[in-house]
Amino acid sequence: GLNLPAGVPEPSASLVAGGNSMDVLITILDRYIRNGLMRSESGRDHALAEDAKSKLRMLGVQITGSGPRLCASPIGRVMAYASAKYDALRDILSAEMQTLGPDIRSVIVTDFEKTSATALVEGVLDDDAGGAVAAYRAVLGCETTDRLDPVLMTGTTVLVDDDLLERIFPRFEQWASERSLDIKFDYIERGDYFEIRGKGKDWLPRYYTMMITEMFQEGVTKCLVGTRGLLGEGWDASRINVLVDLTTVTTSMSINQLRGRSFRLDKHWPEKVANNWDIVCLADEFTKGFDDYLRFKRKHKQLYGVCDDGAIEKGVGHVHAAFTEVEPEGVSETMEIFNEEMLLRARNRVRTRDLWGIGQPFSAVPREAIEIKGVFGEGFPPANRIGLAAWSDES
């Protein structure tokens, strides 16, 4: 590289490391590709530009005529829909079952019913990775969570646990008969579960969603798996006390609509506290291996939550105070500690309810706040270290 001009001090190691961040490098590469290579008269430069743009797309950046734009990256897709998330899903449901017992009402929400893997991630992701069907199979695949008798419902499909069929199928027929609906039910075995099919003009999502939701409220099934299109805004089930978000949406409206599903008063449990879960996959060996964690931070940028000190805070700090400052690499290194703490916290719903201070006076006006931490080791305040008056009775 070039030497620094005379009189310019050597930069610190942290400054050099910051200059190698993806944001800085993308800005430099974008200008070099668009203003240098693409405007060159050399065919070799044009070929190099296309090669560079192709490689940047792998990192989730598309170079356009007007500048860089974010796009889906293969590694980001792998992180979002990794099968390792299903191990965490089973751990979460098992912990919640131990705490809530027969009162558990869990809902698992995904983006799609099935997601087909693209050619770029072929052989890495399953054909239906990240979809509702894959999550449903994961719940059935564990002896503990299989006892929840899960049901999957989307806009086109209804699946029922094989252990549940004998009990729930007659209830389906009874429900339709009591409402004089034109539905003739049938089922097809699909291994560990059955696909419910219906014929007649009333076999529509609006009716079978109402029917299955009613069974869920009663506890015939204690776990629903579905898509955010069906289990999002407009769907209501007051008894939900566990919500697992496997979606990739980060917009304010979608996030608040989804989390709002569990914010319903339950007449059977006046002291109800619902746990909303995010499952995050990290892989520090990849350049884009923290995409899922960064998406998690964007989600909580739109959400309020209670902190350990009872403050209602908007941002990822209400999930864990360490997330406010710690870099993704630090989260990855201490992942097991965070996981253990979250599972322990989930078991203590009484404390969570106390932290919210339900029924106590509060101000509904949001305020911005700056957290200042002293690092001088001389107590409060450290004013004498920044050129202000020293702490005394007079000052």
Language-model features: locations:
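Conserved nucleotide-binding/hydrolysis micro-motifs of P-loop NTPases
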Residues: E113-T115, T157-L159, L230-G232, T248-T251, ...
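Conserved C-terminal RecA-like helicase domain
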Residues: G1-C223
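Short, glycine/charged-enriched secondary-structure capping and boundary segments
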Residues: V121-V124, E166-I168, S238-N241, L258-G260, ...
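Short His-Asn-centered micro-motif
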Residues: V109-T110, G226-R228, D245-T247
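A conserved SF2-helicase RecA2
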Residues: A237-S238, T250-N256, F263-R345, G357
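The feature captures the C-terminal accessory region of ATP-dependent helicases
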Residues: G330-S395
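SF2 helicase motor core recognition
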Residues: T209-Q217, L224-N241, S254-L265
